[in-house]
Amino acid sequence: MFNTLYPYGYMHTMNTIVRTTIFDEWLSHLKDVNGKAHIIKRIRSAERGNFGDRTALGQRVSEMRIHAGPGYRIYFMRIEATVYLLLCGGRKRGQQADILRAKQLARIYKEE
């Protein structure tokens, strides 16, 4: 009965999410426990291929919007087929500065 649940050859690929120390420091300093939980849940979804509400910002940088707290953002870039680098995080209020920072971090990563 359950032998035909998935077609033969079905394979689910997980994404690998790599975090910069800048991103880790930002996340660890968040005092909003509920917001932090939403961010971690969103990262887990991205590992399974569901990035949700995201926008390409140019220079290979994209933004994931988290609909919790003060409008958290995660800035990331794709570095391999299924590998993504979380560059930094921020809030809606500091969005423009965070975007510039993420693009700068992406340039530094590309140069290495």
Model-found features: residue ranges?
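A short, surface-exposed loop/turn module that caps and links secondary-structure elements
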Residues: 41-68
